[in-house]
Amino acid sequence: MTTNYIFVTGGVVSSLGKGIAAASLAAILEARGLNVTIMKLDPYINVDPGTMSPTQHGEVFVTEDGAETDLDLGHYERFIRTKMTRRNNFTTGRIYSEVLRKERRGDYLGATIQVIPHITNAIKERIIEGGEGHDVVLVEIGGTVGDIESLPFLEAIRQMAVDVGREHTLYMHLTLVPYLAAAGEVKTKPTQHSVKELLSIGIQPDVLICRSDRAVPANERAKIALFCNVPEKAVISLKDVDSIYKIPGLLKSQGLDDYICKRFSLTCPEANLAEWEQVLYEESNPGGEVTIGMIGKYVELPDAYKSVIEALKHGGLKNRLTVNIKLIDSQDVETRGEEMLKGLDAILIPGGFGYRGVEGKVLAARYAREHNIPYLGICLGMQVALMEFARNVAGMENANSTEFVPDCKYPVVALITEWRDEDGNVEVRTEESDLGGTMRVGGQQCHLTEGSLVRQMYGEPTIVERHRHRYEVNNMLLKQIEAAGLRVAGRSADNKLVEIIELPNHPWFVACQFHPEFTSTPRDGHPLFAGFVKAAGEYQKRQVK
């Protein structure tokens, strides 16, 4: 099988939407029956985004095989059926660390290590490895053309045309075409200069995607084609839209997929976008709306919760409801109390690390429990729900997590190495013991309890969901909590770790240790989010009555 490569770069400014554009094009090519995947190459020096601040970088997207990756991989999985893996994302930091490790081992036989060829060769090897077995691989280069950090990546993709053949490579450049109100027209000069910058590196773009707040007129597209040496039919206008799921249709309507298939000499049927048309129909024809409060600590940057926000919208699609998401700082809940939570149809507490704002989340979980408001807790959201229930229902005063209070009397959440039984004996771990409690990352099996609400929603006894956490429910204190009325609705494959809890005497109170948002898609949704949004709609109806 010959793999074809589409390299996606951005110019003029950052945040133009390269990831969405690449994912949308991939969706069209997939709809034509092609086997497609997408890669993201990040120029920053961090080895991966796992330890980066969510308020700077946005969320960390976790793949099925346990890689901590860029949030763009979430967009990729929401647009195409191919599951991302650790092969689909790498950084400058990872490339340099691998090259330096080889140098220390003597693999280069004493050669002087340089950006060209050693770093660029390592990048190319990764790209080829990630594209194995696919008809088309789209490779998004992070950052903007002209950034110092991205130069090795741009040089590597320039060399790819030589290595695999120009007939199997295509360069797609996203650029800004701003509209100047004073002049009453769009301006093409920034695009011309961006392409000039790309040409200076040795890359002639084959396709230009022109981002603007309005459709770029045909005469301006012709001008861009002339000055940038690109066929007019390969200059694509991509205007701002109210739904990202309209973009596949926009690109297809301008013949981008036909142009690419001809360029690669691919024979395949026309794209059938019926599934995307159904998504748009559901989105534009809601039967009502609900307001869901998300209580978090990184709310100043919504991208920190990108997958959760999208999953809530998907839940709305499955229920024909518009979901209005109210982002609430958990510290504000601590200081201002329940007034921050009034008027909500449901409450969601997502994952997070660190003590800041935790007591606000505990208060929100209590408010949802006591007022019969639908509640969904994810990761830390499950842990604070457990802490709240232990304190206020199970009689465990000041119950906490050892992440926040290491010497608390009732550590209902702890590392496995900190679990103590009634006699004070520490849980013993061996090399064969479960790895939970260090950092569980990636897809894990979960057995659902017969008769539970979540078993009913999933419709199957065993599921696989993705984790990213260190702390677990403390089994040593679980009996007392269960006796007070809490149900364990899901356990790990070996039945040792609590994965899901729910309250049988509450209309809809579910919390999970895993991250269901990472497997939600607009076409399929996710059982937990669909059930949660449905419960929000039912709560709203009860309040009206």
UniProtKB/Swiss-Prot annotation:
PROSITE patterns: GATASE_TYPE_1. Allosterically activated by GTP, when glutamine is the substrate; GTP has no effect on the reaction when ammonia is the substrate. The allosteric effector GTP functions by stabilizing the protein conformation that binds the tetrahedral intermediate(s) formed during glutamine hydrolysis. Inhibited by the product CTP, via allosteric rather than competitive inhibition. GO terms for cellular component: cytosol. The keyword DNA damage does not apply. InterPro entries: Class_I_gatase-like, CTP_synthase, CTP_synthase_N, GATASE, GATase1_CTP_Synthase, P-loop_NTPase. Mg(2+) binds at residues 72, 140. Keywords: ATP-binding, Glutamine amidotransferase, Ligase, Magnesium, Metal-binding, Nucleotide-binding, Pyrimidine biosynthesis. Pathway: Pyrimidine metabolism; CTP biosynthesis via de novo pathway; CTP from UDP: step 2/2. Residues 1-266 are annotated as: Amidoligase domain. ATP binds at residues 15-20, 72, 239-241. It catalyses: UTP + L-glutamine + ATP + H2O = CTP + L-glutamate + ADP + phosphate + 2 H(+); L-glutamine + H2O = L-glutamate + NH4(+); UTP + NH4(+) + ATP = CTP + ADP + phosphate + 2 H(+). Its EC number is 6.3.4.2. The keyword rRNA-binding does not apply. Residues 291-542 form the Glutamine amidotransferase type-1 domain. CTP binds at residues 14, 147-149, 187-192, 223. UTP binds at residues 14, 187-192, 223. It comes from the Bacteria. Catalyzes the ATP-dependent amination of UTP to CTP with either L-glutamine or ammonia as the source of nitrogen. Regulates intracellular CTP levels through interactions with the four ribonucleotide triphosphates. This is CTP synthase. It comes from Yersinia enterocolitica serotype O:8 / biotype 1B (strain NCTC 13174 / 8081).
